[in-house]
């Protein structure tokens, strides 16, 4: 059955990170550009996959890539915090709600995303797996803009502080696996294995 497209909430793919722990052959690599599944890059995989669920998917990053897609460019070149991407997205898109997801969480199910997008009476609705809060796999309302501005002004880039000081709610999910974050090459290899296993049923 085809997924009904979410057309009233844009999805912003957060890809402005540092990849500091992602090392291949003793060299730091940009994980967004690592080949993934049958796609030339993780970026292309995530963008293509999310377009099956959202009418509008935009990539938030420091610079645009070869992939033909809409980009939101983060101007802060030497500072790495997802808060810049979230703040910039609200200023640019001028929309009440935005769903955010990091580039390096390719296993999050559409069911989980739909569950998060289905609750709209909080400022931040985020995913929580058995061991961890996932503040970046989340639906945000534009009424967080003042809190975002204040956090950036005071240089408090801790996402947990901001979320806990706004009307937020955690949605509990019992599958740890789907929230696997590809911080390292080992995580990346594990994700590839999981998808292979899923494909073979």
Curated annotation (Swiss-Prot):
Entries under Pfam families matching the protein: NTP_transf_3
Binding site for Mg(2+): 104
Subcellular location: Cytoplasm
EC number annotated for this UniProt entry: 2.7.7.77
GO biological process, alphabetically ordered: bis(molybdopterin guanine dinucleotide)molybdenum biosynthetic process
Keyword vocabulary terms for this entry: Cytoplasm, GTP-binding, Magnesium, Metal-binding, Molybdenum cofactor biosynthesis, Nucleotide-binding, Transferase
GO molecular function, one term: GTP binding
Cofactor(s) listed in the protein's UniProt record: Mg(2+)
Any one Gene Ontology cellular component term annotated for this protein: cytoplasm
Reaction it catalyzes: Mo-molybdopterin + GTP + H(+) = Mo-molybdopterin guanine dinucleotide + diphosphate
Positions that bind GTP: 14-16, 31, 104
InterPro entries, sorted: MobA-like_NTP_Trfase, Molybde_CF_guanTrfase, Nucleotide-diphossugar_trans
Similarity comment: family membership: Belongs to the MobA family.
Assembly behavior: Monomer.
Function text: Transfers a GMP moiety from GTP to Mo-molybdopterin (Mo-MPT) cofactor (Moco or molybdenum cofactor) to form Mo-molybdopterin guanine dinucleotide (Mo-MGD) cofactor.
NCBIfam families associated with the record: PRK00560.1 (NF001837)
UniProt remark on domains: The N-terminal domain determines nucleotide recognition and specific binding, while the C-terminal domain determines the specific binding to the target protein.
Official protein name in the record: Molybdenum cofactor guanylyltransferase
Organism: Helicobacter pylori (strain HPAG1)
Gene: mobA
